[in-house]
Curated annotation (Swiss-Prot):
Positions of RING-type zinc fingers: 329-371
Protein name stated in the entry: RING finger containing E3 ubiquitin-protein ligase WSV403
GO terms assigned for molecular function: transferase activity; zinc ion binding
Keywords (A to Z) from UniProt: Host-virus interaction, Metal-binding, Modulation of host ubiquitin pathway by viral E3 ligase, Modulation of host ubiquitin pathway by virus, Transferase, Ubl conjugation pathway, Zinc, Zinc-finger
Pathway(s) per entry: Protein modification; protein ubiquitination
EC number assigned by the record: 2.3.2.27
Recorded catalytic activity of this chain's protein: S-ubiquitinyl-[E2 ubiquitin-conjugating enzyme]-L-cysteine + [acceptor protein]-L-lysine = [E2 ubiquitin-conjugating enzyme]-L-cysteine + N(6)-ubiquitinyl-[acceptor protein]-L-lysine
Species, as recorded: White spot syndrome virus (isolate Shrimp/China/Tongan/1996)
Job of this protein: Probable E3 ubiquitin-protein ligase which accepts ubiquitin from an E2 ubiquitin-conjugating enzyme in the form of a thioester and then directly transfers the ubiquitin to targeted substrates.
Tree of life domain: Viruses
Gene Ontology biological-process annotations: protein ubiquitination; symbiont-mediated perturbation of host ubiquitin-like protein modification
Length: 641
């Protein structure tokens, strides 16, 4: 690895001189004399960056120099302001081993600070945000326990405070779950085991009592920050299992009952989902029997509350149970031998009542066999655990969120009532010297109650005024609504009347147009009828003329035959007769032309009779043209007669 080279300075500065300077001078020296640039080896504790002697610091390493300063400085706030700048260049400064001399094996600097009870400085380092090295914590709380007799984690030490844990919940999800899952060094177990014992209570650097109520605070902060946890839950984002044993073989519930630590028992079941319906201890007994044997009187009332609110009763009759013959629990896979411990799920499968209670404690609300979700009847028997809250999608599953809030309200009501009961039970007899204080307190209480009563009266009066104002507004709104509806109705009627007039006018115009059209149609039909009648008359005349023409044709044909016979029998011998016939031929030719023209006129009139009739008929002209000239002349003579 390449070590960073210190910038040139005026010469070595004795360590004592550095330590004797005030904060501003020390800060200036550290900032100006530290290395202006560094390599990537600053992320390794054993790199030369942290171990190499620096001449300007009296040939001491940066770890020894800063360690000497913060260990000897009584003002921990000032120490933090100085080291916060140093950490920007040396992120693993407090991870590195601190040695007082060469023979000293040394321990990490942050543990040295703990041994010197620099709790406030360590607390500041715990939430320190390194801008240049964001993922690197200032102290390795996620990998090492504090160097004390029992090997506690940071969460179990004087370094931690309520506000600090809340800050970590808001700002660093990774740190949160790393801290929750750190186990105790020697006895093992998580923070659930540690705070389940009354013996482990202590006071932190802010004089806060760190006892079993830490369990409640942690659960509260995690649930309050659920929206942020929904957006990003890391791989280590799990709460330690409350049913896991420590190195001594105890689970947190057993530790709480053996020491009659009733708050821990309540928090473990209602907030962390500890399985309370199992058997406990060496005698294989119920939770209640285990508490009685350990003379845990305060815990008995907690167990009674848990049994009343979170236990399941049978919902299968004896006849149904006998009818099933063999009933297997889908939870433990053992046969259910008694219908009193049998619960039928909405999907039709069966479970032991105690198996179902333990399953719901873990916020597992599906049948393990068919994966059907449980119904509301089962949800109402579930404790308001962290796991349940973290598993609810608040934007879509409003119904389940309401069920959780209802369970949480029941839990809070019990805590309030039970605390009042314990306060009355454990209230000591007051000594005579406290009588004055009692009277003063009673007087002050009466004044507060009187003030509250007045406030309540004012609130009631104000509420009545608001309700009256709301009522008036509602009446005005109803009146205004009626007026608007009436105006809209009137407007609709006017629009409807207008449309009706338009429709009536259109109907009249339509009727007029229909009458005109009917008259035009009638006239056209009459004209057509007249035309048909005229065509019929013309056709009738044409038929008559055709019949007459046929008759004339028949006569012409007959005359032709007679003419042939006459010419054969009687040929004229005189010239005069031939001349006479020749003149007659001219006359006949003229008449024949006149007849042809007449037939053409008649044929034009008969064009409407169809092609078949015209093709089937022969005109007189066509027959006459086929005859010899002499025969034609004779035919004209016949026509003249």
């Amino acid at each position: 690895m390449v070590a960073s080279t210190p910038c040139p300075g005026p010469g070595p500065v004795p360590t004592q001189e550095l330590l004797s300077t005030n904060f501003l001078e020390a800060h200036k020296l550290v900032v100006e004399l530290l290395l202006p640039s560094y390599s990537s080896d600053v992320v390794y504790c054993d790199s030369e960056t942290y171990t190499k002697p620096i001449p300007i610091f009296g040939n001491k390493s940066i770890v020894s120099t800063i360690g000497d300063y913060v260990l000897s400085n009584p003002n921990e706030d000032v120490s933090y302001q100085m080291v916060s700048s140093v950490l920007e260049k040396f992120p693993l400064l407090f991870h590195c081993t601190y040695k007082t001399n060469e023979e000293d094996k040394g321990i990490p600097l942050w543990k040295k600070l703990y041994n010197k009870r620099k709790f406030k400085l360590l607390n500041s380092l715990l939430v320190h945000n390194n801008k240049n090295w964001t993922p690197v914590p200032a102290i390795p709380f996620d990998r090492e326990n504090i160097c004390d007799a029992s090997g506690r984690s940071v969460l179990m030490s004087e370094i931690m405070s309520t506000s600090t844990f809340q800050t970590i919940c808001k700002n660093n999800t990774h740190y949160l779950f790393d801290m929750l899952n750190m186990e105790r060094g020697k006895q093992g177990g998580s923070f659930l085991h540690f705070f389940a014992s009354r013996k482990n209570s202590f006071t932190n650097f802010e004089n806060e009592e760190m006892d079993s109520h830490v369990l409640s605070n942690i659960a509260k902060f995690i649930c309050n920050e659920k929206e942020k946890l929904d957006s990003f839950i890391p791989a280590n984002g799990k709460i330690p299992c409350p049913d896991k044993t420590n190195d001594e073989g105890y689970i947190p519930l057993e530790i709480a009952i053996m020491e009659d630590n009733y708050p821990a028992l309540l928090y473990l079941v209602c907030r962390y989902g500890a399985s309370w319906a199992n058997t406990y201890g060496d005698h294989n007994e119920s939770l209640k029997a285990f508490a009685i044997r350990n003379d845990a009187k305060d815990c008995l009332e907690i167990i009674e509350f848990i049994s009343d609110h979170y236990s399941f009763n049978k919902n299968v009759t004896k006849e149904e149970f006998v009818k099933e013959k063999t009933v297997e629990c889908v939870g433990c896979l053992y046969d259910i031998e008694d219908e009193k411990r049998c619960y039928k799920l909405p999907c039709g499968h069966f479970m032991h009542t105690f198996c179902l209670s333990n399953k719901c404690s873990k916020a597992n609300f599906r049948c393990v066999k068919c994966f059907q979700t449980f119904d509301d009847t089962i949800f109402r028997k579930c404790p308001p655990t962290i796991q349940w809250k973290m598993g609810i999608n608040q934007t879509t599953n409003h119904k389940e969120m309401d069920l959780f809030n209802r369970a949480f309200d029941t839990y809070l009501d019990f805590i309030c009532s039970y605390n009042v009961k314990l306060d009355k039970k454990s209230k000591p007899k007051h000594k005579p010297e406290n009588k004055k204080v009692e009277e003063e307190l009673a007087k002050r209480t009466a004044e507060i109650e009187e003030a509250m009563k007045k406030k309540e009266e004012e609130l009631t009066k104000r509420t009545a005024e608001i309700e009256e104002a709301i009522k008036k507004k509602e009446e005005e709104l109803a009146k205004r609504t009626a007026e608007i509806e009436e105006a809209m109705k009137k407007k609709e009627e006017e629009e409807l009347s207008k449309y009706n007039k338009i429709i009536e006018k259109g109907k009249r115009r339509l009727n007029e147009e229909c009458v005109k059209l009917r008259d035009i149609s009638t006239a056209a039909i009459n004209m057509y009828k007249e035309k048909v009648r005229i065509n019929g008359v013309l056709l009738k005349d044409s038929d008559q003329e055709l019949a007459e023409a046929k008759e004339r044709l028949r006569k012409i044909l007959l005359l032709e035959e007679e003419t042939k016979l006459d010419r054969f029998l009687f040929r004229p011998k005189r010239v005069e007769e031939r001349i006479f016939l020749t003149k007659d031929d001219e006359t006949l030719a003229f008449k024949l032309a006149l007849e042809k023209k007449t037939e053409d006129i008649i044929a034009k009139k008969n064009n409407q009779k169809g092609s078949e009739r015209r093709d089937g008929e022969y005109t007189i002209t066509s027959h006459i043209e086929k005859l010899p000239q002499s025969t034609a002349l004779a035919s004209v003579c016949v026509l003249n007669e």
